[in-house]
Design a protein with these regions (language model features):
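Conserved H-loop
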Residues: 182-189, 424-429
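ABC ATPase NBD coupling module
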Residues: 63-77, 179, 306-320, 463
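Catalytic Walker B motif of ABC-type/P-loop ATPase nucleotide-binding domains
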Residues: 155-159, 397-401
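Conserved beta-strand-loop-alpha-helix hinge in the C-terminal portion
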Residues: 208-230, 450-473
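Conserved ABC ATPase "signature" region
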Residues: 108-126, 350-367
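Helix-to-loop junction immediately C-terminal to a conserved catalytic motif
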Residues: 46, 290
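Conserved ABC ATPase signature
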Residues: 130-134, 138, 372-376, 380
């Protein structure tokens, strides 16, 4: 039996003496607010960064090993928040088989194992595809399967299950539970439902660890409520678009190669919730709305005008897209520079104070405003991306999983802000129907590049089983 012992670990001002034992075969859920140090702890354990004080020990049947001599990549696997950073293979098969070949396994056995792994995470038949062609959820499944195949003694999943639809998450959880006997697992998550499946719950707060014991008990503790600021989202109090409103987006018998087929209308001020399983075409639909891809058949009308290459600049002035994993695309030298790029020529004191107040509305403090984006947590970077998108008050806002990686308090504050933009037309992609139920006017369910269901929010429960079968959390 192997035990990983984290002893008095410190890292700058973020982690202030963390202690816990992690047993092989034990599943630990780790929760905490954005920026509390969860991902930093993951990188410390995986050996990607070194602590400023304290140590990590590996004991095998009670015998302590020198941590500096441990082959960490064989003992510890890490699935990060951003699967695009972790894929290196030219194809799905290469990604799944790369580590196994490096361990010296026979090539024929590896080929057979690759087919099994691909099938187990719903990627059967896609072995020859490039990981770049996969959806975010599919790529996350690929990375998880590739690391599980190496059979590490300990596995860290840093928000790795968040972007998966219900069916895909169930597949990955099945693999994780199958591996539990030989693999200790640390699930970093903001999802209480997922945390309840763990054996033990740890919470990071103010640089310290709080051991909450059994998650079924800990998650009803007032400590968690205090940490996350859990409260109900405000009820919708503003009016929505009427049937006679202007047609802002109109796909007329459009096809985008084999990826997407659309014949839909979106009216000014509408909030459309777009749901469906991973790889169903949700992100592709948003790409089409902003002109990243153009139809091979039919046409897209934007405010009544045919979208063509010549009109892309006009469309993109009116439309803002917040990408999935938007925090990965920040390039400003500071948070302030990222959000207000191009507006700083006349950065008067009064205007600067107003801008800092704007950032505060997204949970971005004046201190964070001067930080480089790459120094922020994943959730903090997501908030910066949202602030940058909303700064210019676009007419159409396209949101691709905007709440990924956010703790509950941050999610509530962002949703409150989004819901207040009643003049905006919003297309909101999510795996979790609950994110949009209080705000959406209509729901689109996507499967295989088609909108297979278009229903008003008032009658969504009539179709609840169809949503569930499709893998949508509701």
């Amino acid at each position: 039996m192997k035990v990983l012992q984290v002893q008095n670990i410190r890292y700058g001002n973020l982690l202030n003496g963390l202690d816990f034992d992690w047993h092989q075969g034990e599943i630990i859920a780790l929760m905490g607010a954005n920026g509390s140090g969860k991902s930093t702890l993951a990188r410390l354990i995986a050996g990607l960064i070194e602590p400023t004080a304290g140590e990590i020990r590996l004991t095998i049947d009670g015998t302590s090993c020198n941590w500096n001599t441990v082959t960490r990549w064989q003992e510890i696997g890490l699935v990060g928040q951003h699967p695009r950073r972790q894929t290196i293979g030219a194809t799905v098969a290469e990604e799944l088989g790369y580590g196994l070949l490096n361990l010296g396994h026979d090539i024929r056995w590896v080929q057979s194992r690759v087919r099994e792994l691909a099938s187990s995470v719903g990627l059967g038949g896609k072995e020859d595809q490039s990981p770049a062609t996969l959806s975010g959820g599919e790529r996350q499944r690929l990375v998880t399967a590739a690391i599980l195949a190496l059979q590490p003694s300990f596995l860290i999943l840093d928000e790795a299950l968040t972007m998966l639809d219900a069916r895909a998450q169930a597949k990955v959880l099945e693999l994780l539970f199958q591996a539990q006997t030989e693999t200790g697992q640390l699930w970093i998550t903001h999802d209480p439902e997922l945390a309840r499946l763990a054996d033990r719950l740890l919470v990071i707060k103010n640089g310290k660890l709080v051991d909450m014991g059994k998650p079924q008990e800990g998650l009803i503790n007032s400590e968690i409520e205090s940490l996350y600021g859990i409260r109900e989202f405000p009820k919708k109090t503003f009016s929505r678009a009427q049937e006679e409103s202007q047609r802002v987006l109109e796909w007329k018998q459009t096809k985008y190669e084999s990826r997407l087929t659309l014949n839909k209308v979106v009216r000014a001020g509408e909030f459309i919730g777009i749901v469906g399983p991973s790889g169903s075409g949700k992100t592709t639909l948003l790409d089409s709305a902003i002109g990243f891809i153009l139809p091979t058949e039919g046409q897209l009308l934007v405010c009544g005008k045919h979208l063509s290459k010549d009109g892309l600049k006009t469309v993109r002035r009116k439309t803002r897209l917040v990408l999935q994993e938007a925090g990965e695309y920040l390039i400003g030298r500071s948070v302030y520079h990222e959000v207000f790029y191009g507006d700083q020529g006349r950065d008067l004191l009064a205007e600067r104070q107003a801008r800092l107040a704007f950032l505060e509305g997204f949970g971005i403090s004046a201190r964070l405003a001067e930080e480089a984006p790459e120094r922020l947590s994943g959730g903090e970077r997501q908030k910066v991306a949202l602030a940058a998108a909303l700064r210019t008050l676009p007419e159409v806002l396209l949101l691709d999983e905007p709440l990924l990686g956010l703790d509950t308090m941050s999610r509530a504050s962002i949703q409150t802000m989004i819901s207040a933009w009643d003049d905006l037309t919003i297309l909101y992609v999510t795996h979790d129907l609950r994110e949009v139920l209080q705000y959406a006017d209509r729901l689109w369910l996507m499967e295989n590049g088609n909108v297979v269901l278009d229903c008003s929010i008032q009658c969504w429960k009539e179709h609840q089983e169809q949503f569930r079968v499709s893998g949508v959390r509701c």
